Regions:
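Two-component/phosphorelay signaling modules centered on CheY-like receiver
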Residues: 16-25
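Short hydrophobic/Thr-rich beta-strand motif most characteristic of the beta2 strand and flanking loop
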Residues: 25-31
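Phosphate-binding/catalytic loops
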Residues: 166-168
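Catalytic beta-strand/loop cores that center a nucleophilic Ser/Cys/Thr
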Residues: 112-160
Length: 169
């Protein structure tokens, strides 16, 4: 089972259906409706942290969950706010983007590794965010896995765990 943390965003249900289409059993839990021990006791194959409004510091258990996934070596994918929560949990800074992107399509350039394996190096994706991971504060345990043509971080990957984040959706 995959546990999908809902940060009160309707895109959570798109992720739910995408994962289901891939044959995964998915349980959706709101970011303020469970504690970490309850989630770990469910013995999931992995977690997905959804997009949502606001900043990682106000995303319920999302940041704490990132640290638990690192400690327990549980796979994790963070999308948008979930991506930011990964960097924030490791003491990275989340800042206002130079330009706000809500429903804008941009070219994404990947490293073709991890979740980007078997995908084109470059592809178009839609962006819905006004916050980004600050490059200068990127924690040492994370590497950049994707960027825009302008260099904005669009993907991060933990160097020692199966933990990835994508800013776009």
């Amino acid at each position: 089972m995959i546990i999908l943390i809902d940060n009160y965003d309707s895109f959570t249900w798109n992720l739910y259906h995408f994962l289901g289409d891939l044959g995964q059993d998915v349980k959706v839990i709101r970011n303020d409706k469970a504690d970490i021990n309850e989630l770990i006791d469910l013995d999931p194959k992995g977690f997905v942290i959804s997009p949502g409004p606001g900043e990682p510091s106000s995303a319920g258990i999302s940041v704490e969950l990132v640290n638990e996934c690192i400690k327990s070596s549980i796979p994790l994918l963070g999308v948008c706010l979930g991506h930011q929560a990964i960097a924030y949990a490791l003491k990275g800074s989340i800042i206002r983007a130079k330009n706000i992107f809500h429903g804008k399509i941009c070219e994404i350039i990947t490293d073709e590794k991890g979740i980007f394996t078997n995908l084109p190096k470059n592809f178009n994706a839609t962006r819905y965010h006004s916050l980004v991971v600050e490059e200068d504060s990127l924690p040492k345990d994370l590497s950049v896995s994707a960027r825009t043509e302008q260099g904005t971080i669009m993907g991060i990957r933990h160097k020692n765990n199966i933990i990835e984040g994508i800013q776009f959706h």
